[in-house]
Amino acid sequence: MSNIQNHQKVVLVGDGAVGSSYAFAMAEEGIAEEFVIVDVVKVRTVGDALDLEDATPFTAPKNIYSGEYSDCKDADLVVITAGAPQKPGETRLDLVNKNLNILSTILKPVVDSGFDGIFLVAANPVDILTYATWKFSGFPKEKVIGSGISLDTARLRVALGKKFNVSPESVDAYILGEHGDSEFAAYSSATIGTKPLLEIAKEEGVSTDELAEIEDSVRNKAYEIINKKGATFYGVGTALMRISKAILRDENAVLPVGAYMDGEYGLNDIYIGTPAVINGQGLNRVIEAPLSDDEKKKMTDSATTLKKVLTDGLNALAEKQDK
């Protein structure tokens, strides 16, 4: 954190497709005056910094450069996108062992630098890695946020906007739970222009089967994109920019994220997708969405799935480190 008033610094760890898309989105929006890129492939970070600085005359002044973990010491926000990418046919949970190991090598030098800002985690499986970031860093839960279901919620709003012929910005609907195969659409509390979505669907002859198909298409959209172009990055890069903006501008914005559960939804000691208030302190509070009985079960089942994978992954990492 600089001595200059209103000077904000962000460090990006992981300069792959998601990281570089996030960096570009931040440059486009003119958010943060100082932006540092860290990656094991140093030459790429130098190239991206040089490329991105050429955008600044068209957007806003910004110091963009290739850096090291030591640059985290005075950062306001550290964004972690580093990790092995999801391959065709591979679920996000399949990535857990590889990416827990990578994460463990990142967090120590970041924390050792003296960093005391906010962590925003986007590497997959994001709910698992967000929990691990909180656990390994020793940071307060409010200062560790996951991108969670931000992208899934955007996908749901896009699909519903198309179905009901409204702007996705006008759709107030959330995907909840794991960022992955056990996620679900919270249709019971969804609205368009304050009117319940289920009521609109009934009036317009949209069946529950059609809504289930939309939910399924959202759940599988990442796999569709990966099969066609190898990876997803523009959507999640923009979602990360939006969360970063809420933090750095102290917005108190209600956003879909991965948040620590402390009794909400009857869940404890887990990070999972939910609406939450995001501001300059990080995660201000969780907003517990009202759920139908069926949705409550889906939330519980999603948490059970995550907890099993989390426990197995952390145990495997501990065994590896003990050898």
UniProtKB/Swiss-Prot annotation:
Binding site for NAD(+): 18, 39, 44, 69, 83-84, 105, 122-124, 147
EC number of this enzyme: 1.1.1.27
Protein's GO biological process: glycolytic process; lactate metabolic process
Highest taxon listed in the record's lineage: Bacteria
Gene Ontology molecular function: any one: L-lactate dehydrogenase activity
Catalytic center residues: 179
Role played: Catalyzes the conversion of lactate to pyruvate.
Entry similarity comment: Belongs to the LDH/MDH superfamily. LDH family.
Subunit annotation: Homotetramer.
NCBIfam families given in the database record: L-LDH-NAD, PRK00066.1
Protein name, per record: L-lactate dehydrogenase
Organism name: Pediococcus acidilactici
